[in-house]
UniProtKB/Swiss-Prot annotation:
Gene3D superfamilies: 1.10.287.310. InterPro entries: Ribosomal_protein_uL29, Ribosomal_uL29, Ribosomal_uL29_CS, Ribosomal_uL29_sf. Pfam families: Ribosomal_L29. GO terms for molecular function: structural constituent of ribosome. PROSITE patterns: RIBOSOMAL_L29. It is found in: Plastid, Chloroplast. One of its GO terms (biological process) is translation. This is Large ribosomal subunit protein uL29c. It comes from the Eukaryota. GO terms for cellular component: chloroplast; cytosolic large ribosomal subunit.
Length: 89
């Protein structure tokens, strides 16, 4: 697997980020399984997989938070508008 920079990950759409999260979790599981069964593996790959997983989840979470905040602001505006129109402040 080639190393993808964080700036390149940000440009990915949400669907690709979700797929990358699943793929990275599988990779991390396989590496941990190799470690537990004392099969040959490269220990630094576990660190890279954990870091990549954290970065991908951070990007996805920040996007979802921004979307939720945007929706929340819209809902609050509608509620305030409705309260203003009905006289319920």
């Amino acid at each position: 697997m080639s190393t993808v920079q964080f700036n390149e990950m940000i440009a990915l759409p949400n669907s690709e980020i979700s797929q990358a999260i699943i793929q990275t979790e599988k990779e991390l599981f396989q590496l941990q399984f190799k470690k537990a069964t004392r099969q040959p593996f490269k220990p630094h790959e576990i660190k890279k997989a954990k870091r990549r997983l954290a970065q991908l989840k951070t990007i996805l979470t920040s996007r979802l938070d921004a979307l939720e905040k945007k929706r929340g602001n819209t809902v609050m505006k509608l509620i305030k508008k409705q309260n203003y129109m009905t006289g319920n402040f």
